[in-house]
Amino acid sequence: MLTWTPLESNPEVLTKYIHKLGVSPAWSVTDVIGLEDDTLEWIPRPVKAFILLFPCSETYEKHRAEEHDRIKEVEEQHPEDLFYMRQFTHNACGTVALIHSVANNKEVDIDRGVLKDFLEKTASLSPEERGRALEKDEKFTADHEALAQEGQTNAANHEKVIHHFIALVNKEGTLYELDGRKSFPIKHGPTSEETFVKDAAKVCKEFMARDPNEVRFTVLALTAAQQ
């Protein structure tokens, strides 16, 4: 498996990254400093996605396996334009979460560049084929590596990274968890433009509740850029 340098959960670096990929400067990645109602009010609006970084603990891996076995028995329907891709490149989860966040929000303008080219090239492909396409995309690899090196902690490629990024988005009134390590998108119930922030925060709290002794969680959001 190809290994990339892991991205830091640094909103400034991630904002620079999405802009380099072609996302309009009108959008940025922002820290979510708390998940209670009063702190959620501080997040710049509109909020188009939550990005959660969490530890892949034994408890979480057990939950993931049980969830997979439960959902694979059900033929769930998803919107045709839900963009979902698998992750086959080690440490690419940050990039995959950003792709999921941007690609599932038509309001987020993307100029011609690496990301737009990738989305157009993979539009008709399966989630697995999209993951393989990213693995072979030399431009995406180069951009990821360049920005990953700007993080506050330059983790070496051979280090074992136990944290993982996922995206939470509102797609046609359903809150989706998009995780390239999983075989399919995960539905977390109904949501709306007005309730998305609180609904996504609730899902983040559920991740934290599964590992009550763990503190290594980071929550970010794709939002309108602050003026």
Swiss-Prot record:
Enzyme class of the recorded protein, top EC level: hydrolase
Protein name per the record: Ubiquitin carboxyl-terminal hydrolase
Enzymatic reactions: Thiol-dependent hydrolysis of ester, thioester, amide, peptide and isopeptide bonds formed by the C-terminal Gly of ubiquitin (a 76-residue protein attached to proteins as an intracellular targeting signal)
Protein origin, superkingdom: Eukaryota
SUPFAM superfamilies for the chain: Cysteine proteinases (SSF54001)
Site, Transition state stabilizer: residue positions: Q87
Enzyme Commission number, as recorded: 3.4.19.12
Function: Ubiquitin-protein hydrolase is involved both in the processing of ubiquitin precursors and of ubiquitinated proteins. This enzyme is a thiol protease that recognizes and hydrolyzes a peptide bond at the C-terminal glycine of ubiquitin.
Family statement drawn from the similarity comment of this UniProt entry: Belongs to the peptidase C12 family.
UniProt gene name: Uch
Signal peptide span: none
UCH catalytic domain boundaries: 3-224
Statement: the UniProt record of this protein carries the keyword Protease: yes
Record organism: Drosophila melanogaster
